[in-house]
């Protein structure tokens, strides 16, 4: 009998290094909760919102908090059903995407959407990291690593405004989120390294579709206004105000369709996990 294909060999994870990298990711996400406090007026000006319309900018902060809190029970349950490292890396990827969308935002709707995506990714890092601690340490030795995770989360919340002030002193507010994205990419590589390798095989189809979709979305967000608005079918509409949305133009819609297709492809491959009846309960608790 011919033996089946062998699974790729994974190194044993390095518990302390993995805890350190995951804890830094948790601190980064926690810092992002309030990193925008001092940058709020600059961000409003960057997306064409005047200081007299401050109430319209509150979703920049509350949107992040909403995503952060709502995803906690869902990610906690997903971490029970599949690889903890896989969930952690997925949340880091979502956080990076949200940071890039926020950095490229040219109107309030896109900015708020980017912050919500950031919150979803950042909030998911907490239960995923706690699940990793439960896997790597026996019950009688979990007190210290769990305390470290809780401490760095609070430390990140305290340092967020200070880090934002330091960056604003030397750069534009968008660099806050570009550095977030860069830090997320570096932490992803470190988690893969310290966690023993990639916890799954990347499939070429959905990966290529996601890369193309994100590239088109990036072009739509970063392109000159003439490319996204001065074209046929580029109807301007934004539910947040009178500004023109670059996502509701042909190039923006194409990027959304491609990215959504990649997401649906991935969901189809994860249908066994998604079929679990109690997963719906976790979603309802989060909402």
Model segments located where?
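Transmembrane-helix bundle of Major Facilitator Superfamily
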Residues: 2-195
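Hydrophobic transmembrane-helix bundles of small-molecule transporters
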Residues: 174-287
């Amino acid at each position: 009998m011919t033996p089946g294909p062998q699974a790729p060999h994974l190194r044993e994870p390095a518990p302390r290094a993995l805890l350190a990298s995951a804890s830094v990711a948790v601190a980064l996400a926690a810092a992002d909760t309030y990193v925008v406090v001092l940058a709020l007026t600059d961000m409003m000006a960057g997306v064409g919102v005047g200081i007299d319309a401050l109430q319209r900018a509150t979703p920049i902060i509350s949107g992040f908090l909403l995503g952060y809190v709502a995803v906690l029970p869902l990610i906690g349950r997903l971490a029970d059903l599949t690889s903890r490292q896989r969930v952690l890396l997925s949340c880091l990827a979502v956080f990076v995407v949200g940071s890039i969308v926020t950095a490229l935002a040219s109107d309030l709707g896109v900015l708020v959407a980017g912050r919500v995506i950031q919150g979803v990714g950042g909030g998911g890092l907490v239960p995923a990291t706690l699940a990793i601690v439960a896997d790597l340490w026996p019950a009688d030795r979990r007190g210290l690593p769990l305390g470290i995770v809780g401490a760095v989360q609070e430390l990140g919340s305290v340092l967020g405004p200070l880090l934002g002030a330091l960056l604003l002193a030397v750069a534009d507010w968008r660099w806050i989120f570009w550095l977030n994205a860069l830090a997320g990419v570096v932490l992803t590589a470190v988690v893969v390294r310290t966690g023993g390798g990639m916890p799954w095989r990347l499939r070429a189809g959905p990966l290529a579709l996601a890369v193309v979709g994100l590239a088109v979305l990036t072009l739509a967000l970063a392109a000159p206004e003439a490319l996204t608005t001065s074209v046929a079918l580029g109807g301007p509409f934004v539910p947040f105000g009178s500004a023109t949305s670059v996502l509701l133009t042909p190039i923006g819609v194409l990027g959304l369709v491609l990215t959504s297709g990649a997401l649906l492809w991935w969901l189809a491959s994860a249908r066994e996990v998604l079929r679990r009846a109690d997963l719906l309960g976790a979603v309802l608790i989060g909402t």
